[in-house]
Amino acid sequence: MESGVKRMSAYKIIALVILVILAILFAFPLYWIVTGAFKTQASINATTPEWFPSVWVLDNFKKLFSRQMAPLWEFAVPFSSHFSSTGEDIIFSAGPMVPAAIRWLVNTVFMAVAAMVLTCITASMAGYALAKKRFNGRALLFSLIVCAMALPKQVILIPLLREMSTLSLYNTLWAVIVPTVGWPFGVFLMKQFSEGIPGELMESARIDGASEIKTFTNIVIPMIKPGIGALAIFTFINSWNDYFMQLIMLSSTSKLTISLGIAKLQAENSTDFGLIMAGATLAAIPIIVIFIAFQKYFTQGITMGAVKG
């Protein structure tokens, strides 16, 4: 018995050591980027790596915020690009001038938050309907959604690009937001959570005279809240880091996101790694904040989703 306990303790210690090593390996790139943002160019390009900055400087952030200026926001006349001689939207209101990096950050936050909110709303409704409603073709529809999860974005790029152009959404942030709203993974995740809602609870709500909307908002939403929290994090990070779609759908300088802006910082003949690391550090802050804010729901969502799946 005692040997068995010692053997289990040894396994736990080995597992803990492996997990710590993996955590260090995953966290090291973030550490290197953040510390690199505060290093001098000479320290970054040194032959011997400098694991910890000997001198902390803000020169990279000063360069990042002094490269060029842009309005904090712009409100354009809808569909005005069709009537403009330059093909650009006609701006009727613009915010104060700020560093371009701040504008990139504002564009990305708006895009990611809008995609997160709209995806959580549509996915929770669709998942609930697929889990609790009986209608013809339900199984076929869910099978198509699962199949859509396996399709890479490159497969639907041309139809999606033509659709956004037809809807006059091309070269707007909505061209990146709208395709995310129908994210198949979100519908799949919400269906898994909705299946765990007791049917008796919903039946009693109908007997009490609750409408479909009231049943959904007062019963379904509170019970799938952990799943919504997990989906919110997934959607926010997916939209924030979706460099490919942003590169294809956005062409104007005023529509640049933080990912496109960082890529633009690379010069043709030389690369200022300190400047790029400063931009990457700025881009990582909102993701870290969102993860910390939704960490409880994210952990619950992953655990409960795994059990229900």
Where are these predicted regions, by residue range?
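A structural signal for multi-pass alpha-helical bundles of membrane permease subunits
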Residues: K6-R7, Y11-G309
